[in-house]
Swiss-Prot record:
The keyword Transferase applies. This is E4 ubiquitin-protein ligase UFD2. Present with 2600 molecules/cell in log phase SD medium. InterPro entries: Ub_conjug_fac_E4_core, UBE4, Ubox_domain, Znf_RING/FYVE/PHD. Its main location: cytoplasm. GO terms for cellular component: cytoplasm; nucleus; ubiquitin ligase complex. It catalyses: S-ubiquitinyl-[E2 ubiquitin-conjugating enzyme]-L-cysteine + [acceptor protein]-L-lysine = [E2 ubiquitin-conjugating enzyme]-L-cysteine + N(6)-ubiquitinyl-[acceptor protein]-L-lysine. Keywords: Cytoplasm, Nucleus, Transferase, Ubl conjugation pathway. Belongs to the ubiquitin conjugation factor E4 family. Interacts with CDC48. Interacts with the ubiquitin-like domain of RAD23 and DSK2. Interacts with PEX29. Residues 880-954 form the U-box domain.
Amino acid sequence: MTAIEDILQITTDPSDTRGYSLLKSEEVPQGSTLGVDFIDTLLLYQLTENEKLDKPFEYLNDCFRRNQQQKRITKNKPNAESLHSTFQEIDRLVIGYGVVALQIENFCMNGAFINYITGIVSNVNSYTDFLSQIIQRAILEGTALDLLNAVFPTLLEYCNKHVSHFDLNESVIYNNVLTIFELFVTFKPIAEIFTKIDGFFADYSCKPQDFERKTILGPILSLSPIEAAVAIRNYGDNLLRSKQQTAMIHESLQAEHKVVIDRLFFIVDKLVRGSLNSRTDMISYFAHIANKNHLRRADHPPFKELSSNGFMSNITLLLVRFSQPFLDISYKKIDKIDANYFNNPSLFIDLSGETRLNSDFKEADAFYDKNRKTADSKPNFISDCFFLTLTYLHYGLGGTLSFEEKMGSEIKALKEEIEKVKKIAANHDVFARFITAQLSKMEKALKTTESLRFALQGFFAHRSLQLEVFDFICGASTFLIRVVDPEHEFPFKQIKLPLIPDQIGVENVDNADFLRAHAPVPFKYYPEFVVEGPVNYSLYISKYQTSPIFRNPRLGSFVEFTTMVLRCPELVSNPHLKGKLVQLLSVGAMPLTDNSPGFMMDIFEHDELVNKNLLYALLDFYVIVEKTGSSSQFYDKFNSRYSISIILEELYYKIPSYKNQLIWQSQNNADFFVRFVARMLNDLTFLLDEGLSNLAEVHNIQNELDNRARGAPPTREEEDKELQTRLASASRQAKSSCGLADKSMKLFEIYSKDIPAAFVTPEIVYRLASMLNYNLESLVGPKCGELKVKDPQSYSFNPKDLLKALTTVYINLSEQSEFISAVAKDERSFNRNLFVRAVDILGRKTGLASPEFIEKLLNFANKAEEQRKADEEEDLEYGDVPDEFLDPLMYTIMKDPVILPASKMNIDRSTIKAHLLSDSTDPFNRMPLKLEDVTPNEELRQKILCFKKQKKEEAKHKASE
């Protein structure tokens, strides 16, 4: 029968010229007509005896395709019905042998699974119909798992060993491999058992970097534009290209990556929907990978010993997509997420060693032991998926963005090292060959690093994918507020803040134990990464022009969560984390490039939860960030306060309700507001002193180096190189301190104008006056020339603007008698002539001040001078004051003496209040101290009053004589 011969391409005729295989079998005599009864014999011969058939699986596929073609050709022919049974038999046997060939490797004479897979991958479209039939047959026969165990471990071997790189550079190969996965998992019975394939899971001992090579899904989950080889291919040829050219490469890779993610999601989604077991296995697989990769968020991660950025980021994106249905804007399924998820006995996520939001390990373990759920109470997929996504946001995508953040310094160091080696090469011919080899390695490393950075920036600039991530973060923010809400009804019912009464007392700024004891359960026991991951991502992504944060309709949810965390200090104990929150809010507060309001300002104004709580939250955190618990806490606080100052300034000028709130706080919550002003004063005092001192050092070193360059003899011991190092250090510190001081000074200006009373309380006013006088002397006094440096703007230093700001504060407080008195009492720095000099600079020399401004400043200086003279006369009246009447810290006569409980020292109430604003201990023995524990010394107060009265009467008596 010709049809059978044509389909199977075999003949019994030795003279046949069609090139078909000549059948050599005793079962079929030469010249016999090949009927249906011989099909099985013919196929067996071809597969098991024909030595010339070197591609048996390809042969079966070709037979199948030819059979389908013959069906179509003969469909309308007269003998179609008689041929139908023949074609059916060929299909049955070819598909059957296809199943056998893919299950028993040595069944065919030249059989080899790797050859079959190589053939399929190289031309997958021609195999899809045949493979579909094989899959269905295996399912019917109950041998589907055997089929899978032959195909996919071999496919893994192919990806690892039989292509140079399985990545986006090999477009045909990776697309065809994805097609194979898609084809198989489309069949639900396959998806149900797919996770049972040998090699789907890695051994527990598997190293983090081996998941991509040793697990079935590993290679396809690694397909990413941020893999090194892909980055070099796309970005490495021309690292100096234009921004437009770079953007075009970004867009091309983004489009390709989007398709890859869509296809990966299709595959994993089929597995998740396959069965309860396959769904659980997928979660377990992803969790195992995350648990092995905690070092990705270490300070110095050993990235070569961890899973790759592409692999971890892809899994993050997939999990984010799985979370979308239950975190959509309607929040109809938000109650499906188990708030007590971490109470489950068999968690996939490894929490050992995880820092908690506001509890120690021992307390957290005790809580979970006491409240552990029963073994049969397993969490639902939604809860597993949600918390695993948060885990990956921290260790997956979070590790990737951390990697990118470190690359800038890496590239800079490599470039410096290359220049250094080039100079050595130019001066040492004897080492030329060795140096050239080293230089080549370093330049290759630089090219790789720069290419990777471009690739990572392109990845994070991919707005559509990053929008999905930030949407998840907004949904997660809403859920976390719901967990904290005592009623657990948010967002359908507004949460009421604060959760516990505010701790206003000046000595309670660091009452960590109290806050921990009152933190809400179970939120306080959550791992810190549930907050840190979203915060790190949001802060990082905000620097991109395409950032998903900008003008995002769901941004309000995240700002609400941020406000809640700052407003309720008991929620999160880590001040660094809260520092990042205020940094992010400052980004959203700053005006945009077109000078329009910051992209969060509308939320600050119109979101009810935010508008009611943000101002208090910022003022409170400004105070309590004083102590961060780290070795760098002294400087950490300045960065956080700088961010807060940016927000406060924008709120004050742009949104009237915040200005009204601020004034209300100063009038009705005086202790709280004074605490804030005291911290501002501490910072400004230090920063101005630090900034101006370093500018003086810069001035001196610049002069020394200039003089040496002109041939003058050195006046300092340091060599030029050491001087350059010291100059760089002083310049950095001057720039940092002056920049931070400028923002604090701005707040002093605007607040002292509208709320002057807050700046003249007894515990504040003397320190404020001293600070202003000292810095006025620095700017216009005899040593002001030491502040002249080259390019002062580069240090964020504008002496004229600073002088104008300082004198503005004097004018703002000029009607306050307490302030006039405090300025006059500053014997160290107050001098009326300094004000005259300031007026000359601001008026005649620069024109920065109006005649009205100058008049007010001189009037204030005259009042202060008159007060100084009056104070001198009063001091003469009092003469020698008994030591017991003098404040032991300020050496002034006490007005309201109190006794400290531990040291039993007498001290003025205003002095100890000022001390407790920044230190909650007795200044004489460092024992803990609260203001309410001091005892008024009424007897001593009366003695002092009698002393003053007596001295005044004596003075009057002398004057009348």
